[in-house]
A protein has these predicted regions:
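Phosphate-binding beta-loop-alpha motif at adenosine-nucleotide cofactor sites
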Residues: 104-108, 206-219, 239-243, 264-280
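Pre-Walker A adenine-sensing motif
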Residues: 87-97
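A glycine- and Lys/Arg-enriched "phosphate-lid" helix/loop adjacent to the NTP-binding pocket
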Residues: 175-191, 201-253, 302-307
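NTP-dependent small-molecule kinase module
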Residues: 253-256, 260-329
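Charged, amphipathic alpha-helical linker segments immediately N-terminal to NTP-binding catalytic cores
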Residues: 2-9, 13-84
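Post-Walker A helix-loop "phosphate-sensing" segment adjacent to the P-loop in P-loop NTPases
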Residues: 124-133, 296
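Glycine-rich phosphate-binding P-loop
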Residues: 105-123
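Conserved nucleotide-sensing/catalytic segment adjacent to the nucleotide-binding pocket
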Residues: 74, 129-191
């Protein structure tokens, strides 16, 4: 059943708006005073995802074709829904900033599964001062001597921050395990310690959301070929990607083992069906919004005052400045 949102009459709308504004100011004051308690209370009172966020009705007729199979999401519909969800992401970040909420998002999956594209759509509308993306490379010789989680911990969010890991500590259970970059003993140690590590994060007040982007071998092959044909995207295809392509079954087994040991109630895995990139992005963003108990605290629009005159200021001569050449007159 589709949810219906009642729209008040004009007179009632004015009163409701004033009351809502007063209520939000009170919530903002409470959030700043006690961020942890506010986040906990908001989480317990939050509406269910289906009540707070639901796709537009226009999607109903475009999900399947005449044969009953899912079709690729139409670009115009996708862009319209993405714009709506990105506005909600801005509201979410504003609440996170002022409530002191901390959240870590992990994006895992096979090569070319669409992790980076989804991260890009999440971060596009957000203030970069409160949102960071971490994509760590191969550990240095010094890092190899440290506690395995150490190089990830140093990037963890402070109060009011959103942190997105484009691949994470689960490299040990995946690529390092399959490619032989670590010992079987190190893999087993990771399987045992990772759940406790994540429980510790949750107990400390950090929300941990783990997304696995699932892509079929046929779709991955098509995306690899697309990257080879596009000079601007060819850098995305590395020798390691080609090696993992030949080890599909080994990676599948490693992923199953990883899920078996780390799919804990405090930080479960959420699988994103990613053969359709557009649908995967929308589904992931929708799910993220449903998991953060935010309320709309965004301030009212600001009215710009008249611009002040220049007074006695005189611009310096243009011939004394260096300009970027105008290549597109």
């Amino acid at each position: 059943m589709t949810n219906v949102v009642a729209i008040p009459a004009d007179g009632q709308a004015g009163k409701k708006k004033k009351g809502l504004k007063k209520s939000l100011k009170k919530k903002l004051k409470e959030a700043k005073k006690n961020p942890a308690a506010h986040a906990k209370a908001a989480k317990s009172k939050a509406q269910s995802p289906i009540d707070r966020y639901f796709p537009s009705p226009i999607f109903d007729d475009f999900s399947v074709n005449s044969e009953g199979r899912k079709t690729r999401l139409d670009r115009k519909l996708y862009e319209k829904e993405l714009a709506r969800l990105q506005v909600e992401l801005v509201k979410m970040q504003y609440w996170i900033k002022h409530s002191g909420y901390r959240i870590i998002l992990l994006f895992e999956g096979r090569d070319a599964a669409g992790k980076g594209g989804t991260i890009k759509r999440i971060t596009e509308p957000l203030n970069p001062r409160g949102c960071r993306v971490v994509a760590l490379g191969t550990p240095s010789d010094q890092q190899k001597t440290q506690w395995y989680f150490q190089r990830y911990v140093e990037h963890f969010p402070s109060a009011g921050e959103i942190l997105l890991f484009d691949r994470s500590w689960y490299n040990r259970a995946g690529v390092e395990n399959v490619m032989g970059f670590c010992t079987p003993q190190q893999v087993e140690e990771f399987r045992q310690s990772c759940p406790e590590f994540e429980r510790m994060l949750v107990r400390s007040g950090i929300t941990v959301l783990k997304y696995w982007f699932s892509v079929s071998d046929e779709e991955q092959e098509a995306r690899f070929r697309s990257r080879l044909e596009d000079p601007a995207r060819r850098w995305k295809l590395s020798p390691m990607d080609l090696e993992s392509r030949d080890r599909w079954v080994e990676f599948s087994k490693a992923k199953d083992e990883m899920f078996a040991h780390s799919n804990i109630p405090e930080a479960p895995w959420f699988t994103v069906e990613a053969d359709d990139k557009r649908r995967a992005r929308l589904n992931c963003i929708q799910h993220l919004l449903s998991k953060v108990p935010y309320v709309d605290m965004t301030p009212e629009p600001i009215e710009l005052p008249p611009r002040l005159g220049g007074g006695d200021y005189q611009r310096p001569p243009l011939n004394e400045q260096f300009f970027v050449p105008n290549c597109y007159p």
